[in-house]
Structure formats: structure tokens, C-alpha cells
Regions:
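Helical "substrate-binding/catalytic lid" subdomain
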Residues: 13-116
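Disorder-to-helix initiation segments
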Residues: 8-12
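Short, basic/aromatic-enriched C-terminal tail that caps enzymatic domains
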Residues: 113-131
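A short, charged helix-loop
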Residues: 1-7
């Protein structure tokens, strides 16, 4: 698909989209880990349907978190590149930098991958607690 005839717009589109996608993954990871600690993860997931109606927030959260665990190292580097692109646009890359940190962090928890969200969150928490 051709986005534009202008040089660099396709790359800028891809990187700006990555900020959004990887950012949602980072937010879900952090939110679900905290929610699991408090025992409210299902309540939080159910409440998200009011904002963004998806057929299965549990499956979406599991999928997005697992992608970060599986590909965190590569995604962190992509987010550092995105941060540079955001900065070149004159925007402080506060979120892009934070997303890169969360993706780096996620890469260290790859062993927690599971087809079950609760099991995956518990495995991450156990690994985190033992460090």
C-alpha cells in the first residue's frame, strides 16, 4: 500500500503506528500486573468494554502481553527508533521512551508465556518477586 509520494512518510506512518500499538501493549501489561496483585483484573478488563467494545478483552490482553514478552527486545529497539522520529517532529518522546523501557523489561519475562492470562501474569509476578 502506498501512503504518500513524499519520502519518509511511509516510515513515519509505521513508527507512529508502532507508538500506539506497543503503547497499548505496555499499558495492558502494567495495568494487568497491578490489577492481578489486587485481584481485580477481570473487573478492569470488563470495564474496558465501556470505552472500547471488543468481543474478548481477556483474550486481547493475553495476546498483546504475550507479544511483548515474545518480541520485547526487537520492539524496544523499534520504540527507540520511534522516539527519535517523534523527537524529530518536535514532540517530546515521553511515551515512546517509556514504551521502550517496558518492552525491554518484557523481554526478560519471556519464560512466562502462557495461553492463559492469569497464569502468565502469575508467572511474571513470581519471576519479578524472586529477583
Amino acid at each position: 500500500e502506498v501512503y504518500s509520494d513524499k519520502v519518509g512518510q511511509a516510515a513515519a506512518t509505521k513508527l507512529c503506528r508502532s507508538v500506539m500499538i506497543k503503547g497499548v501493549e505496555a499499558l495492558l501489561t502494567e495495568s494487568m500486573l497491578a490489577a492481578r496483585r489486587y485481584g481485580v483484573e477481570q473487573v478492569v478488563l470488563d470495564s474496558l468494554s465501556d470505552l472500547l467494545p471488543l468481543p474478548d478483552w481477556n483474550a486481547t490482553a493475553r495476546y498483546m502481553i504475550s507479544r511483548s514478552l515474545e518480541h520485547g527486545s526487537r520492539r524496544a529497539e523499534e520504540m527507540r527508533e520511534a522516539a527519535r522520529t517523534v523527537a524529530e517532529a518536535g514532540v517530546a518522546p515521553l511515551m515512546s521512551d517509556a514504551i521502550a523501557k517496558r518492552q525491554d523489561w518484557a523481554a526478560g519475562h519471556r519464560d512466562a508465556l502462557s495461553p492463559d492470562l492469569a497464569a502468565m501474569l502469575d508467572a511474571i509476578t513470581e519471576t519479578q518477586d524472586s529477583r
